[in-house]
């Protein structure tokens, strides 16, 4: 089975929702990966997607980051966060990652850290996050769409 996947940095789902929904209609997208949704899970406009017959899953955060996936097919959640892999961090509250399975296809929606300025704590976080992502994808032994 084939299906059309698209990625869209929405830079605030509240501000871009009409554009996103219109774009989905015009392009007959089956699965959309959205980054920078910038909203908490409770405020994500899931009903708007459901009215268009999309299943939706999201990992939100107030004002920053946030990722979401809308699909015409069933979505099976795998995880919303990367393991730490002894990267000298205790927690990661940034909503940047969502791994799902749709029609037996593993799909990861992610919003990579910027890391500016370098050197500095944001840069260190980015490097650590990228190492964790690399370990996660390599250890899966499966094909992934990122």
How does the language model describe each region?
Residues 3, 145-146:
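Residue-level recognition of the N-termini of beta-strands and the immediately preceding loop/turn
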Residues 123-145:
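A long, amphipathic alpha-helix that forms part
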Residues 19-22, 28-34, 87, 91, ...:
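Glycosyltransferase catalytic domains, chiefly GT-A lineage
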Residues 27, 52, 103, 143-144:
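Structured helix-beta-strand junction loops
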């Amino acid at each position: 089975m084939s299906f059309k996947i698209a990625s869209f940095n929405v830079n605030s789902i509240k501000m871009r929702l009409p554009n996103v929904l219109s774009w989905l209609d015009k392009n007959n997208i089956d699965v959309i990966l959205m980054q920078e949704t910038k909203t908490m899970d409770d405020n994500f406009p899931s009903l708007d997607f459901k009215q268009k017959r999309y299943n939706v899953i999201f990992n939100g955060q107030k004002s920053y980051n946030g990722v979401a996936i809308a699909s015409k097919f069933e979505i099976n959640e795998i995880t919303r966060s990367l393991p730490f892999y002894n990267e000298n961090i205790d927690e990661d509250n940034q909503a940047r990652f969502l791994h799902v399975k749709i029609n037996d296809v593993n799909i990861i929606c992610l919003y990579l850290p910027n890391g500016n300025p370098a050197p500095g704590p944001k840069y260190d976080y980015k490097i650590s996050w990228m190492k964790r992502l690399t370990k996660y994808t390599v250890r899966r032994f499966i094909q992934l769409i990122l």
